[in-house]
Amino acid sequence: MNFLRKIVKSCKDEEDQKPALVSAPPDDDDLWLPPPESVPLTEISGKKNMRNFCINGEVKICSPNGYSFKILRHILKSFDGIYSGNRRMIGLVKVVIGLALSGAPVPEGMNWVYKIRRTLVFQWAESRGPLDGEELEYSQEITWDDDSEFIGLQIRVSARQCHIQGRVWCINMNSRACQLWSDMSLKTQQSDEDKNTSLLLE
């Protein structure tokens, strides 16, 4: 068993920073709950505090025996407490993680890799969000480890403001992305300009 665990841990990239540890999920953690109150559903009509970002996101999952979204969701429920990036862009990072994990993974050795590369439109509430022209290069490893199972979650997100026409991060309210945003406690409020649009509060 120890030999297997050593092999498993070799699928992680070597990182200088110590990965954050997350405790085991409760047995009833796989319930599919309603998403947060409001996410963008249609084209954004209000232009207030709207910014386009060119996004490159990658979520790499290392696990020897496959993995369930039950454990991933449990890990992401602790995201606010373990996030090590720029706090002004944590909402953007949550959106990218949710969208990436809603796509199809590509096997890579003992890893499953989810990638997203697109231009997205974000709107923040007044005085929230990144500073004008601010960019993000965020990388973090989070692990869940006990005597029977190991899962390593590597997250990389780069974001820079760009002038390419972007898409709103609209998605079906019953989608996996919405559930993941709910797990990560994505903070939003309904826009005064457009009832179908949410402003990020983080």
From Swiss-Prot:
InterPro entries: Rhabdo_M, Rhabdovirus_M_sf. A motif (PPXY motif) lies at residues 35-38. Disulfide bonds: none annotated. GO terms for cellular component: host cell endomembrane system; membrane; viral envelope; virion membrane. Keywords: Host membrane, Host-virus interaction, Membrane, Phosphoprotein, Viral budding, Viral budding via the host ESCRT complexes, Viral envelope protein, Viral matrix protein, Viral release from host cell, Virion. The keyword Membrane applies. One of its GO terms (biological process) is viral budding via host ESCRT complex. It comes from the Viruses. The keyword Membrane applies. Pfam families: Rhabdo_M2. Residues 115-151 are annotated as: Essential for glycoprotein binding. Plays a major role in assembly and budding of virion. Completely covers the ribonucleoprotein coil and keep it in condensed bullet-shaped form. Inhibits viral transcription and stimulates replication. Plays a major role in early induction of TRAIL-mediated apoptosis in infected neurons. Late-budding domains (L domains) are short sequence motifs essential for viral particle budding. They recruit proteins of the host ESCRT machinery (Endosomal Sorting Complex Required for Transport) or ESCRT-associated proteins. Matrix protein contains one L domain: a PPXY motif which potentially interacts with the WW domain 3 of NEDD4 E3 ubiquitin ligase (Potential). This is Matrix protein. It comes from Khujand virus (KHUV). The gene is M.
